Amino acid sequence: MSVLKLKNADFENEILKKEGIALVDFYADWCGPCKMLAPVIEEISAERPDVTVAKINVDEEGELASKYGVMSIPTLIIFKNGEENERIVGFKQKRAILSML
């Protein structure tokens, strides 16, 4: 499954109204750790087709980042059945992220 690039308008239908697990990466193009995390997110998306994986650019979707209290990037939020379940701030290795899904 490919990584979804979400806008505020898509977030509710793609993440909040879906059953199952979703991994949402809040990032910015200029962020070094975000760039390091990008291939890890792609790998997780390929390895875990049962998980909805999405990216949200905080520079373009500041309202959504603010709504979820994203203060540092990268921030990964894991949703289960539309509810926030876990939060990871900063770069993490793939195995650490997978263990939280």
PLM regions with names:
Residues 2, 7, 27, 54:
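Conserved Rossmann-like nucleotide-binding pocket used by diverse enzymes
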Residues 3-21, 62:
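A short beta-strand-turn-helix
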Residues 11, 24, 41, 57, ...:
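Residue-level signature of catalytic and energy-coupling elements of molecular machines
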Residues 19-21, 38-56, 60-62:
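Conserved helix-turn-beta segment immediately C-terminal to the redox Cys motif
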Residues 22, 62, 68-77, 95:
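Structural micro-motif
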Residues 26-39:
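Conserved redox-active cysteine motifs that mediate thiol-disulfide chemistry
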Residues 77-101:
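Non-catalytic, surface beta->alpha helical segment in thiol-disulfide oxidoreductase systems
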